Amino acid sequence: MAQAKINAKANEGRFCRSSSMADRSSRLLESLDQLELRVEALREAATAVEQEKEILLEMIHSIQNSQDMRQISDGEREELNLTANRLMGRTLTVEVSVETIRNPQQQESLKHATRIIDEVVNKFLDDLGNAKSHLMSLYSACSSEVPHGPVDQKFQSIVIGCALEDQKKIKRRLETLLRNIENSDKAIKLLEHSKGAGSKTLQQNAESRFN
């Protein structure tokens, strides 16, 4: 009888310890789950800051190279450029880096995709029209929407092999490049229009002198 009581107490002790360990494990797992959510929120916030930095730099650069900037006095342009350079310098002081975890295959896919985009960018000066068409086909390969033009199937398969975060960055880079080309086209057209209007005015003035 005494031995049975001793065994019962021993079993009770083991049950208490086991129950206590399970509770601790559950609490620790719950804490880690909550921390995982905060880690992902931190990465998302840092990525948002990265994107905001890119957008700000692009906007400052766009203002500096705008047609409006060319149509003001030298003194005003110099003053505005000083302000723009100051803002650009302050923006560049913000350093945010979100590293993407990649396996070897994803790393190789990213290098391949980056190399293809760089090759197109290097052709800008030689043939802007062709480069723009090529970029649009690359962008269509990254878009989940129904493409409005041709899709570079080879590039699409390469991008699919990249990490999800890298896929988003590739798409953003292509969007930025296409916007820059669009802005350049507009600036050239405005410049040609202003030159054409100026030539027409000069011609009219010359004709009026002879009449």
Swiss-Prot record:
This is BAG family molecular chaperone regulator 2. Binds to the ATPase domain of HSP/HSC70 chaperones. May interact with NWD1. Interacts with HSPA1A (via NBD), HSPA1B (via NBD) and HSPA8. May interact with DNJC9; the interaction seems to be histone-dependent. The keyword Coiled coil applies. The modification N-acetylalanine is found at residue 2. Co-chaperone for HSP70 and HSC70 chaperone proteins. Acts as a nucleotide-exchange factor (NEF) promoting the release of ADP from the HSP70 and HSC70 proteins thereby triggering client/substrate protein release. GO terms for molecular function: adenyl-nucleotide exchange factor activity; heat shock protein binding; identical protein binding; protein-folding chaperone binding; tau protein binding; transmembrane transporter binding; ubiquitin protein ligase binding. The modification Phosphoserine is found at residues 20, 31, 73. PROSITE patterns: BAG. Keywords: Acetylation, Chaperone, Coiled coil, Phosphoprotein. Residues 20-61 form a coiled coil. GO terms for biological process: negative regulation of protein ubiquitination; positive regulation of proteasomal protein catabolic process; positive regulation of protein processing; protein folding; protein metabolic process; protein stabilization. It comes from the Eukaryota. Residues 109-189 form the BAG domain. One of its GO terms (cellular component) is dendritic microtubule. The gene is BAG2. It comes from Homo sapiens (Human).
